[in-house]
Amino acid sequence: DDNFKPGLACTPDQQNGTWIMQAHEWGKYVGKAEFKLENGQLTLLNYKLLPVNLYVDKQHPDGTTSSVLANEYITPNPQLNAFLAEYQEKGAKQIEGKIGYVNARLEGDRNKVRYQQTNLARVIIQAQMNSTDADFGIMSGGGVRDSIAAGEVSYKDILKAQPFQNRVAYIDIAGEDLWQYLEVVTRFPPDSGAYMQYHKLSFEHKNNTLVKVLINGQALDKSKTYRMSINNFNASGGDGYPALTTAKGFVVTDETDSNALKRFFAEHSPIDAAQFAPK
């Protein structure tokens, strides 16, 4: 929830009797849940998010705003810092340094990828299409986690945009089945993680009914077979996408989404962002 502020009440999601909890993102909070187990019955008593050296905007009486800590500063443990320093250095060497270049910003901000098509999503999908030799590709907008600034691009930049290490997958799907699949996924609304990003695909609804689908500019032929790239999270039903994992023609590759994007930058830089602008 973009409107959540430290100290506000929050309730985790529950699905099929199982509590599902996530302490927001990027280590900003630690989630604390208190349960009672009595006579085999588990009850959630309390749940809250504890800010970790998180700065928030504070409005002053004179109308100005300043950035202040949401709670008392938590001093890092020096012994633990010293222990982790070696691993931090090793990790930094692996993810820093130029792997490619882009001539303009690639948009991946949350308030964009969940509402509209963006150039970064299209670059990500193109990378996965290249990896699988697909005709077109899709992914949920919630899977894009950060933008990539114009200029030199590092593996760190890519991992910030694609941090989940999902596997690149694809399905060879009959046109008739593809139409039925698209009838579902093209309806996911903006302002949700499920909102579909797509590339080399266009479609049209009329009276809330899917009436037109183009793949690479050509009308979908229900008698043909198409190859669609998708990550294994969405293919497994993530974000409410119809599950494809047991369908005929479905394949999960060994390549992660971040590695596919890294390889795309390495092989195709300098990248012209305008070529991936939504139309």
Task: Give the ranges of each region predicted by the language model.
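Feature captures C-terminal
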Residues: L8-W19, Y29, Q41-L45, T118, ...
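Hard-cation-handling environments
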Residues: L45-V153
